[in-house]
């Protein structure tokens, strides 16, 4: 994990729940279970978005569980993998909101490198089994991440899409940060994601703070 995050979260790594979580992952591997993303990419979101560069948080639920999809960034898949339906809808909203044409390139690393923390609440999953690693400790860890950002950063824009992400609102100090809410971009979700205009709104909020806007185009 990137140094600024490792230092910020040092206390979490020492806690019994995290030791239990690591033990669980070792036991899964020992039992022959395939885990996504690969071990080197579990903390990819932190590695690509150092704490001092953080401007935006996009919160997802848990990693994609299909072969080759998960690479440690919420909603993102590596190049060469077809964009999942939620990501396609995100691109449609960007096109509508910003009046630009997206290439369909599904790897969101360029956003991460500009200060967008693409954080899943759960950072691993068993192959082919959605939400199989929920309730093993990851939520406690990523809640601590959100709390740390809330307490130690200023003016971060949190994009909370869907009912699960919205439950994290209580961890965020809305007097110091900006919280934008919408329905989940999944085609199966109820409510309005289209028309939320979160991408232009995020940039307006960043510019108002004298921060560089995010180039959302891919």
Question: What are the language-model segments listed below?
Answer:
Residues 2, 11-160, 164-167, 172-173, ...:
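A polyanion-binding, active-site-adjacent surface
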């Amino acid at each position: 994990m990137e140094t600024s995050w490792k230092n910020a979260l040092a206390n979490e790594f020492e806690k019994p729940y995290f030791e239990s979580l690591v033990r669980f992952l070792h036991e899964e591997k020992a039992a022959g279970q395939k885990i996504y993303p690969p071990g080197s990419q579990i903390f990819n979101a932190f590695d690509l978005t150092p704490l001092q560069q953080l401007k935006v948080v996009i919160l997802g639920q848990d990693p994609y569980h299909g072969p080759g999809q998960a690479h440690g960034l919420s909603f993102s898949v590596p190049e060469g993998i077809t964009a999942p339906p939620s990501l396609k809808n995100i691109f449609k909203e960007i096109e509508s909101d910003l009046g630009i044409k997206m290439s369909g390139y599904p790897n969101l690393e360029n956003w991460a490198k500009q200060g967008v923390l693409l954080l899943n609440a759960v950072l691993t999953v068993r192959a082919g089994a959605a939400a199989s690693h929920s309730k093993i400790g990851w939520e406690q860890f990523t809640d601590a991440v959100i709390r740390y950002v809330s307490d130690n950063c200023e003016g971060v824009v949190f994009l909370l899409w869907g009912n699960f992400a919205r439950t994290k609102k209580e961890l965020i100090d809305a007097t110091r940060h900006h919280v934008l809410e919408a329905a989940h971009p999944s085609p199966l979700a109820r409510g309005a994601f289209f028309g939320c205009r979160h991408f232009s709104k995020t940039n307006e909020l960043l510019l108002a703070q004298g921060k560089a806007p995010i180039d959302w185009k891919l």
